[in-house]
UniProtKB/Swiss-Prot annotation:
Its EC number is 3.8.1.2. Catalyzes the hydrolytic dehalogenation of small (S)-2-haloalkanoic acids to yield the corresponding (R)-2-hydroxyalkanoic acids. Active with 2-halogenated carboxylic acids and converts only the S-isomer (or L-isomer) of 2-chloropropionic acid with inversion of configuration to produce R-lactate (or D-isomer). Keywords: Hydrolase. InterPro entries: 2-HAD (IPR006328), HAD-like_sf (IPR036412), HAD-SF_hydro_IA (IPR006439), HAD_sf (IPR023214), PGP-like_dom2 (IPR023198), S-2-haloacid_dehalogenase (IPR051540). It comes from Xanthobacter autotrophicus. PANTHER family: HALOACID DEHALOGENASE, TYPE II (AFU_ORTHOLOGUE AFUA_2G07750)-RELATED, HYDROLASE, HALOACID DELAHOGENASE-RELATED. This is (S)-2-haloacid dehalogenase. The keyword Membrane does not apply. The active site is at D8. It is an enzyme of class 3 (hydrolase). The keyword Hydrolase applies. The record marks T12, K147, Y153 as: Important for catalytic activity.
Length: 253
C-alpha cells in the first residue's frame, strides 16, 4: 500500500521555464536561448560530476552551467547578475495545480526529493507558500550524488521510514522516471506535453529553443523502464492515488 508520495521539484512541481523572465530582462532578445541552454547544461554538469566523482552542490553546478551558456554568446556573468539569477531560481513559479494536488494527498506523507541544494529548496518551497504541504524536503546533498544515482533515491527510505513498495514517485523528467523505477519505486510521470503536440511543434518549421528543450526533456527516455502511470497534470494525481491506496485523502476543494 502506498504510504508516501514523493515529488521531484524542478520541472515537476515548479516550472523551470519561469526563470525566462529574469534572463530576458537581463539580456533582451536572448532570454529564451539562455534559459534553455542553461537548463540543459545544468543537468549535463550534474551527471558529469556524478560520473567523475567530483560533487558540487546544485547552485555551484547551476552557476557553472550559466557561465557556459553566457560564454556561448561572448558574455561574462558578473556577481550582481548571478545574485539575480539565484533569486529567480528560488522563486520559480509552482505549476497551477501543484498546491491543490498536494492538499488532496493528505494525510499520506508528502515529500520532495531533489537535486537542489538544501538552502535552494527551502527558499523555493517557502517562497511558493508550500512549506506546510510537505513532511520532508530532501536534498541529494546528504549523499553527495545526483539523481538518477540509486543512493539519492535511498534517502526517501531513510528520511520517511518507508520501503520502495510504499512509495509513489512523481516526476516529469525522463531521467528521473528511469532512475526511480530502477530503484524500485512505483512511478507516475507527469506528461504535460502529448506526443501529438510535440510532433506538431517539431514539424512546424524553425525549431525554437523552447521546442528543443521539450524534445530533449519532456519525453520518456528509451533506455529506461517505462513509468507505472502517466498523468497529464498534477491535478490528476490524487484520483490515481485514491485508486492505488484506497487512501482516505483530503476532499477536493
Amino acid at each position: 500500500m502506498i504510504k508516501a508520495v514523493v515529488f521531484d521539484a524542478y520541472g515537476t512541481l515548479f516550472d523551470v521555464q519561469s526563470v525566462a523572465d529574469a534572463t530576458e530582462r537581463a539580456y533582451p532578445g536572448r532570454g529564451e536561448y539562455i534559459t534553455q541552454v542553461w537548463r540543459q547544461k545544468q543537468l549535463e554538469y550534474s551527471w558529469l560530476r556524478a560520473l567523475m566523482g567530483r560533487y558540487a552542490d546544485f547552485w555551484g553546478v547551476t552557476r557553472e552551467a550559466l557561465a557556459y551558456t553566457l560564454g556561448t554568446l561572448g558574455l561574462e556573468p558578473d556577481e550582481s547578475f548571478l545574485a539575480d539569477m539565484a533569486q529567480a531560481y528560488n522563486r520559480l513559479t509552482p505549476y497551477p495545480d501543484a498546491a491543490q494536488c498536494l492538499a488532496e494527498l493528505a494525510p499520506l506523507k508528502r515529500a520532495i526529493l531533489s537535486n537542489g541544494a538544501p538552502d535552494m529548496l527551502q527558499a523555493l518551497v517557502a517562497n511558493a507558500g508550500l512549506t506546510d504541504s510537505f513532511d520532508a524536503v530532501i536534498s541529494v546533498d546528504a549523499k553527495r550524488v545526483f539523481k538518477p544515482h540509486p543512493d539519492s533515491y535511498a534517502l526517501v527510505e531513510e528520511v520517511l521510514g518507508v520501503t520502495p513498495a510504499e512509495v509513489l514517485f512523481v516526476s516529469s523528467n525522463g531521467f528521473d522516471v528511469g532512475g526511480a523505477k530502477n530503484f524500485g519505486f512505483s512511478v507516475a510521470r507527469v506528461a504535460r506535453l502529448s506526443q501529438e503536440a510535440l510532433a506538431r511543434e517539431l514539424v512546424s518549421g524553425t525549431i525554437a529553443p523552447l521546442t528543443m528543450f521539450k524534445a530533449l526533456r519532456m519525453r520518456e527516455e528509451t533506455y529506461a523502464e517505462a513509468p507505472d502511470f502517466v498523468v497529464p497534470a498534477l491535478g490528476d494525481l490524487p484520483r490515481l492515488v485514491r485508486g492505488m491506496a484506497g487512501a482516505h485523502l483530503a476532499p477536493a476543494v
